[in-house]
């Protein structure tokens, strides 16, 4: 019997699933480029709406809530902390939920609904508790979109192409991170709240349309079973799409991480999870992987990356005001040189990770940041020459920030994939990837939370120049840990260990 029009419509909208009836646009909706673009737009929306609201928060608290000026800073900080805290708490929850569901689309849409609710509450809210709940919902949305989005990317492109994919996505979303605060302040100044939230709802509409249309490859393959003659990229697994890059990365990993005896069995034994695991480890199977120092170092790299970003976010506006008497709009312009190189060089460094491995890129990037951060001691109050010096050093910092984006995510994904390959029964069919990126999102959010606090305390107690000296020392320590653990222990250290 031919399927009814209603069945076709429900299948197309993914409301009802009948694998004997293909949804409209199956090929392009399950295409690698469309899936990755959907993830990129989701992450862009999250960061854009976060940045769009931040410059408006002080005015919202004063005009709509009536917060006195002397309590404004503490309330703004509290709303920022509510966002970060919710991301920390809900990231692992999002990972566990996603790995227990048959598809990624449902939790991906759940995150968008949380963001929609948050935006409506921010637009209409006129009390502090409502604004706090709205920021918590924004944090919940961030936890889901980053956790599910990164897991979906890995499943779509495979580990061999993950570096350049993440680099390209981060490059794209950095546009939102750069433009949103400037646009939010400008729209509020010219149009008030309707203009700010009008563009927010427009971007949410585009994001919703893409998320409802996207079809995961593993879901699309179930439709293709009834039509094996279909010509799509569905029959090409991520491993087949790596154009030899995985062979190169595998060879490098073998060179760096292979036991000195060269035994494949011994290599796999390092990733073997014993059968004697507590109940919580079977409920959350990513937990045994946390004993791996490489994975812990990958998380540390993500934490330091976020802490550096939070450091710049917290100090650039105050330095611009203290040194050069800049207002909020001109302070925002100083973020452009910092983010421009991230936008341009993100895909290149992602390609370098896929081509040369995580160790050289992470070590070089963090080592490069050491002298650049130390040189940030040079700018002082003054005229155009000092402004140009500060802007130039921020641009150089942007190069380093572009280099540290991809290695931690790619390294963590590669390690957990190895655990999954050696212990497929322990992890189940879906694997622990959403749990992995849930933890990664949690660590990153913690870094974003600590970064501004640490930067503010250090700047007040020892000065801006010495604060950057401390951050440079942290980058040097991180580079050393990357050299030892990321990509596997170097042979010379492995021999000494034996």
Model-derived regions, located:
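Extracytoplasmic gate region of multi-pass secondary transporters
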Residues: 54, 293-336
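Central cavity-lining transmembrane alpha-helices of secondary-active solute carriers
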Residues: 78-95, 336-348
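Conserved MFS/SLC helix-loop-helix module at the cytosolic interface between two early adjacent transmembrane helices
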Residues: 89-125, 129
């Amino acid at each position: 019997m031919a399927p009814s029009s209603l069945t076709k419509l429900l299948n197309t909208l993914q409301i009802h699933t009948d694998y004997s009836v293909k949804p409209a646009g199956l090929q392009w909706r399950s295409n690698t480029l469309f899936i990755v673009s959907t993830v990129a737009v989701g992450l862009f929306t999250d960061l854009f709406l976060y940045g769009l609201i931040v410059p408006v928060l002080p005015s919202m608290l004063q005009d709509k809530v009536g917060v006195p000026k002397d309590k404004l800073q503490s309330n703004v900080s509290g709303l920022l902390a509510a966002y970060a805290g919710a991301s920390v708490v809900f990231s692992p929850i999002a990972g566990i939920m996603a790995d227990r569901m048959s598809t990624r689309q449902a939790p991906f849409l759940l995150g968008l609904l949380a963001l929609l609710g948050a935006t409506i509450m921010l637009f209409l809210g006129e009390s502090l508790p409502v604004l706090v709940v709205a920021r918590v919902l924004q944090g919940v949305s961030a936890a889901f979109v980053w956790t599910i989005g990164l897991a979906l990317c890995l499943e779509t492109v495979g580990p061999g192409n993950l570096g350049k994919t993440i680099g390209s996505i981060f490059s794209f979303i950095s546009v939102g991170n750069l433009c949103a605060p400037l646009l939010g302040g400008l729209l509020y100044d010219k149009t008030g709240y309707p203009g700010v939230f009008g563009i927010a709802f427009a971007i949410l509409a585009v994001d919703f349309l893409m998320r409802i249309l996207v079809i995961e490859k593993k879901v699309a393959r179930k439709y293709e079973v009834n039509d094996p003659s279909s010509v799509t990229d569905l029959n090409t697994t991520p491993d087949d799409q790596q154009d030899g890059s995985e062979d190169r990365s595998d060879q490098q990993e073998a060179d760096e991480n292979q036991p000195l005896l060269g035994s494949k069995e011994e290599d796999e034994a390092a990733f073997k999870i014993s059968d004697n695991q507590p109940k919580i480890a079977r409920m959350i199977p990513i937990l045994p992987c946390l004993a791996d120092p490489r994975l812990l170092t990958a998380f540390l790299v993500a934490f330091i990356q976020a802490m550096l970003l939070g450091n710049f976010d917290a100090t650039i506006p105050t330095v611009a005001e203290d040194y050069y008497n800049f207002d909020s709009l001109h302070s925002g312009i100083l973020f452009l040189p910092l983010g421009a190189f991230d936008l341009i060089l993100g895909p290149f460094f992602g390609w370098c990770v896929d081509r040369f491995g995580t160790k050289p890129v992470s070590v070089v990037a963090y080592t490069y940041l050491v002298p650049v951060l130390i040189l940030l001691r040079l700018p002082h109050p003054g005229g155009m020459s000092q402004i140009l010096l500060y802007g130039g050093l921020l641009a150089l910092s942007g190069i380093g920030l572009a280099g540290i984006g991809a290695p931690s995510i790619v390294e963590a994904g590669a390690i957990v994939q190895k655990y999954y390959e050696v212990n497929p029964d322990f992890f189940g069919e879906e694997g622990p990837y959403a749990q992995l990126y849930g933890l990664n999102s949690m660590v990153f959010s913690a870094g974003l939370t600590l970064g501004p606090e640490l930067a503010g305390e250090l700047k007040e107690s020892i000065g801006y120049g010495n604060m950057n000296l401390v951050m440079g020392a942290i980058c040097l320590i991180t580079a050393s840990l990357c050299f030892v653990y990321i990509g596997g222990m170097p042979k010379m250290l492995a021999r000494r260990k034996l």
